[in-house]
Regions:
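Conserved donor-binding/catalytic core segment of Leloir-type glycosyltransferases
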Residues: 8, 216-233, 242
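Aromatic "clamp/platform" in nucleotide-sugar-dependent glycosyltransferases that forms part
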Residues: 298
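Membrane-proximal helix-turn-helix segments that form the acceptor-binding/catalytic region
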Residues: 89, 141-159
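Short alpha-helical donor nucleotide-sugar binding micro-motif in glycosyltransferases
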Residues: 285-290
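Active-site proximal beta-strand in glycosyltransferases
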Residues: 99-101, 114-135
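Short hydrophobic beta-strand element within catalytic cores of glycosyltransferases
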Residues: 315-318
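Nucleotide-activated donor-binding/catalytic signature segment of Leloir-type glycosyltransferases, i.e.
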Residues: 260-284
Length: 387
């Protein structure tokens, strides 16, 4: 058997973030077929626990999960525009990878550095959406981010995408060079070892006990939303749904901003409960005990939370928009227009009346697609096609 090809993943977020978890998924997908390495671009913001122990040079560490880990440090991603370059070149020359795989376009400024350090290596960029590029046209921060950090993304040799919708949007924004480059939609995996249905379906009594345990008393059911406070997430519609159904508890997981606090207070939404964050096991229990996952986002590059909820045995209702439509059409109810709060509320009524709103066959097909097995096959298929 010949030597395995080397692949180096480059990520700037820790393993508790979505990009960090995705990097670990990619390492898991390839480590049996490739000599796998990861370069963590570390900053105090995303690796605070390691700041005191950081070393002046990258010291490779063999991880028990089957890969070699390297690291370089900067004070922030922005200072890393200069500070990451030289130490990253050093790592690249030491590893001499056949493939350099960047986890997100915000690291595009490093693509030319990788090409300079390893001219024969193929560079791959994972594109997740174009929100940073298109949603904030008047923001100086995002203008600079696009100009200096993201634009060089088009210099990569090939691209992978989380959805067909993202691929289309990226082609429109980045233009012909990306559109004509080799590429593949590889999706995103869910952690099926964590997000799965209990052995026995959760009973109505168990749901009520769970609500009481978490401070939600005298409600007929519970809805769940997991999201950032961004305009594209359409949280206002979720809160309007709460106003329409005051006898149901509406849980939101995410930062409780001043804007959201004002909406809750102005509408006197005593049935809205906020949790800033959960650990993974806590989130699974909320998924399992909710009556309905509500995901009214206008724009999503993929949309994992409703898929995770369905994997846990809980129905979802989503907006018929962007990649959510691509993934969930035919699986669960989709609402259009996305801000029709009454339409979401009617789906809730059907569920509380005992109706099944999920197509079981379509859901199984979706969960198979989002399994690590399916994800690994697509990643490896793409890499093998690149030679």
């Amino acid at each position: 058997m010949g030597l395995k090809q080397k692949i180096l993943f480059i990520c700037d977020k820790n393993e508790r973030t979505s990009f960090g978890r995705l990097t670990m998924n990619l390492l898991d997908a390839v480590h049996e077929k490739y000599d796998a390495h990861v370069l963590w671009l570390k900053t105090p913001k995303f690796f605070p626990d390691e700041v005191a122990a950081k070393k002046p040079a990258s010291v490779p560490v063999e991880d028990a999960r089957g890969f070699m880990a390297h690291e370089v440090w900067a004070k922030s991603l922005y200072t890393g525009f200069f500070a990451f370059r030289s130490p990253m070149k050093k790592v690249l020359r030491e590893v001499a990878p056949d493939v350099v795989f960047f986890i997100r376009p915000e690291l595009g400024f490093l693509v030319p550095i990788a090409k300079s350090a390893c001219p024969s290596a193929k560079s791959v960029m994972f594109v997740h959406d174009t929100f940073a590029e298109t949603l904030y046209p008047h923001s100086v921060k995002f203008k600079l981010l696009n100009m200096f950090f993201i634009r060089p993304t088009v210099c990569a040799d090939s691209f992978v995408y989380n959805s067909g919708w993202t691929r289309g949007e990226a082609a429109k924004y980045f233009g012909k060079k990306m559109a004509d480059a080799p590429g593949k939609v590889i999706g995103c995996p869910i952690d099926s070892a964590l997000f799965n249905a209990p052995e026995s379906p959760v009973t109505k009594e168990e749901r009520a006990a769970f609500r009481r345990k978490n401070g939600m008393r005298n409600f007929q059911g519970m809805c769940l939303n997991v999201s950032l406070d961004e305009p594209r997430k359409n949280i206002d519609t979720y809160f309007e749904m709460a106003r329409l159904r005051p006898d149901v508890a509406f849980v939101r997981v995410g930062k409780f901003s001043e804007r959201l606090r004002n909406i809750v207070n102005e509408k006197r939404l005593y049935n809205v409960f906020h949790f800033n964050e959960f650990n993974a096991l806590e989130l699974r229990e909320f998924y399992r005990h909710a009556d309905l996952m509500v995901y009214p986002s206008f724009l999503e590059g993929f949309g994992l939370p409703p898929i995770e909820a369905i994997a846990c045995g809980t129905p979802a209702v989503c907006a018929r928009a962007s990649a959510v439509k691509e993934n969930l059409d035919g699986v669960c109810p989709l609402v259009t227009p996305a801000d029709d709060a009454e339409a979401y509320a009617r789906v809730l009524d059907r569920i509380l009346a005992g109706e099944n709103v999920i197509d079981a066959g379509a859901a199984r097909k979706l969960l198979d697609y989002c399994s690590m097995k399916g994800f690994s096959e697509r990643v490896l298929g793409f890499l093998e096609a690149q030679g």
